[in-house]
From Swiss-Prot:
One of its GO terms (biological process) is translation. The gene is rpmE. This is Large ribosomal subunit protein bL31. Its cofactor is Zn(2+). NCBIfam families: L31 (TIGR00105), PRK00019.1 (NF000612), PRK00528.1 (NF001809). Binds the 23S rRNA. Coiled coil: none annotated.
């Protein structure tokens, strides 16, 4: 590798979330600010909402005048 062209790597970079959670990781920046982390994201907290996509087949059949019975 060429000398002097690579950014300095910090093994103890602090990641701060908008919810107040913070943890360390490796990065070329000393501090990272994020809006969502594993402590506040709905997927990880179990408060995830299932999006109902029901009715798509019926809508398709209605659009093309198909009778599935």
């Amino acid at each position: 590798m060429k000398q002097g062209i690579h950014p300095e790597y910090h093994t103890d970079a602090v990641v701060k979330c908008a919810c107040g959670n913070s943890f360390t990781t490796g990065s070329v920046k000393e501090e990272l600010k994020v809006e969502i982390c594993s402590k506040c994201h709905p997927f990880f907290t179990g408060k995830q909402k299932i999006v109902d996509v029901g009715g798509r087949v019926e809508k398709f059949n209605k659009r093309f005048n198909l009778d599935t019975k």
